Structures are given as C-alpha cells and as structure tokens.
Amino acid sequence: MNKALFLCLVVLCAAVVFAAEDLQKAKHAPFKRGAAPCFCPGKADRGDLWILRGTCPGGYGYTSNCYNWPNICCYPH
C-alpha cells in the first residue's frame, strides 16, 4: 500500500513539473494563446481567429473584425 501511494505521489509531482514547463513554452508561442491565424474577404493581412466568441477580446488592440459563425476573426490596427 505504501509503495502504491509513493508511486502516485511521484507521478503527480512529475505531472506538475511537465505542466509548468509547457506553460513556459506557451509564452514563446508564434501566435497568441487561444488564437489561430485567419483571413477575411477584402483584408490583405492576417487576423486572429477566436473560436466560439461573439466579440473580440479586449487588451489586444483589435480595431476590426469579421464573423465566421460561430467564430470571429479579429484584426489589429
């Protein structure tokens, strides 16, 4: 019983370490977390696709958008 409990504790600690490492890599991702590249008709640049959102999130400097139901493509500046 003690060996099984110790093994569960080791697995839990390893999961926490690997999860924290993955979060550090996410900070250096090529695009914003939660957004994927998208294109709208009539726009030359690439936008950020936000899945299952009705509006563009605040704090990213988005100034225009287009809808691809149920998603939204948001454009900065």
Swiss-Prot record:
GO terms for biological process: regulation of blood pressure. Belongs to the sea anemone type 3 (BDS) potassium channel toxin family. This is Kappa-actitoxin-Avd4h. Disulfide bonds join C38-C73, C40-C66, C56-C74. SUPFAM superfamilies: Defensin-like. Experimental results show no expression in the ectodermal tissue from the distal and proximal tentacles, body wall, and oral disk. Since paralogs are expressed in this tissue, an expression of this toxin in this tissue is probable. The negative results could be explained by the very low abundance of EST sequences. It is found in: Secreted; Nematocyst. Residues 20-31 form a propeptide. The keyword Cell membrane does not apply. One of its GO terms (cellular component) is extracellular region. Blocks Kv3 voltage-gated potassium channels. Reduces blood pressure. Residues 1-19 form the signal peptide. GO terms for molecular function: ion channel inhibitor activity; potassium channel regulator activity; toxin activity. Pfam families: Defensin_4 (PF07936). It comes from the Eukaryota.
